[in-house]
């Protein structure tokens, strides 16, 4: 998902108005007393209180594995639908098999998970053990089978790799690969060295942020979007994924230093991206005498864009702080606190919104609202033993 919509997307969405249905569900009990990995600015206490019911209401969909995955990402492996764990629904209903060289491998179709290995990384991140069993088409498997299949099916060539599909695989492999034994042979006989994949990810961060780095060095706000903003959710997934790699020992001291350099830039982006978003939505705003429905839709897109970037950013910041990868300076702490206020404002603005209003007529916006709410909740309340391994 992109951080902002284009003018064409806005105009196409502007004519969409629809009714919806309601689902209910309680917050998983395990989330009530557990302590987050790190503390976040106090204003976000109220933010998570708004997000939790939005997630439990809108993410319990039996026919939408992408939404289910995000519910698990926010609430952890105990997230249920009709008393059945979403983790088991995802594995038993939506996984498929692919045959390569006479052997079957498990995978989640990309039309279900959005990006390769998004389902696997979600299961591993929330602490589902590799031994966890499930049944698919009458056959017994484990999450470990899915993890081994992902490695077997992974193909890597830095000359042709889609750098916008890398983040989810980086997370999954960082959690199941021992740094000292990070080389394997895939199903087609290609040797994969995970260190090379991590380096490619770090190179991507560097190459897509050149303009931002220049503006930061000059002490000015950017005049245009940088390339990283064209990556999914403004490149935040890639940054988080590389933090997972470094935290789990991949890439050594050089990777840690390169990541730390980017984290400094990302805190600067809390101001820079906000500046660019505000400018974009001011220019795209409908006239004051426009149809109220159009004005409301424009406002929802604006608030979701901020929810997306700042929610994903707090995932990065919370994870990096919790794993000793980031110790903000006093000035950076002030920037983070301002980002927290912006995130709270965006969430407060969508409080009470019925996301189902958009599910049939504007499914992209529906997915934005649900997914971004889930990532923001996880960033605010990243809790070991609940929604974080």
Regions found by a protein language model. Give the residues of each.
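N-terminal secretory signal peptides that target proteins for export/translocation
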Residues: 1-3
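N-terminal export signals
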Residues: 9-30
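Preference for long, amphipathic alpha-helical scaffolds in soluble/luminal domains
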Residues: 30-389
């Amino acid at each position: 998902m992109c951080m902002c919509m284009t003018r064409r997307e806005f105009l196409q969405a502007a004519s969409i108005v629809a009714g919806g249905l309601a689902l209910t569900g309680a917050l998983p009990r395990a989330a009530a007393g557990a302590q987050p990995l790190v503390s976040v600015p106090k204003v976000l206490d109220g933010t998570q209180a708004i997000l939790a019911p939005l997630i439990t209401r809108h993410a319990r969909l039996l026919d939408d594995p992408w939404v289910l995955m995000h519910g698990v990402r926010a609430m952890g492996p105990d997230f249920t639908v009709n008393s059945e764990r979403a983790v088991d629904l995802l594995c038993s209903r939506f996984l498929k098999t692919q045959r390569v060289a006479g052997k079957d491998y498990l995978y989640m179709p990309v039309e279900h998970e959005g990006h390769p290995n998004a389902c696997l990384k979600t299961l591993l991140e929330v602490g589902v053990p590799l031994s966890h069993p499930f049944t698919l088409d009458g056959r017994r498997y484990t999450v470990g089978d899915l993890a081994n299949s992902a490695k077997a099916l992974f193909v890597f060539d830095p000359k042709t790799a889609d750098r916008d599909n890398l983040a989810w695989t980086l997370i999954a492999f960082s959690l199941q690969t021992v740094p000292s034994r990070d080389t394997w042979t895939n199903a087609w006989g290609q040797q994969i060295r995970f260190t090379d994949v991590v380096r490619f990810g770090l190179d991507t961060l560097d190459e897509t942020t050149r303009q931002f780095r220049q503006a930061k060095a000059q002490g000015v706000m950017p005049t245009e979007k940088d390339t990283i903003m064209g990556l999914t959710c403004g490149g935040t997934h890639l940054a988080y994924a590389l933090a997972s790699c470094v935290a789990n020992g991949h890439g050594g001291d050089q990777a840690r230093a390169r990541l730390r350099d980017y984290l400094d830039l990302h805190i600067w982006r809390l101001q820079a991206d906000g500046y660019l978003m505000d400018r974009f939505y001011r220019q795209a705003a409908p006239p004051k005498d426009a149809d109220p429905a159009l004005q409301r839709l424009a406002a929802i897109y604006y608030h979701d864009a901020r929810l997306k970037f700042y929610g994903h950013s707090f995932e990065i910041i919370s994870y990096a702080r919790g794993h000793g990868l980031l110790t903000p300076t006093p000035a950076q702490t002030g920037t983070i606190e301002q980002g927290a206020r912006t995130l709270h404002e965006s969430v407060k603005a969508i409080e009470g919104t019925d996301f189902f209003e958009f599910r049939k007529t504007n499914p992209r916006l529906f997915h934005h609202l649900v997914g971004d709410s889930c990532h923001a909740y996880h960033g605010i309340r990243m809790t070991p033993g609940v929604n974080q391994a």
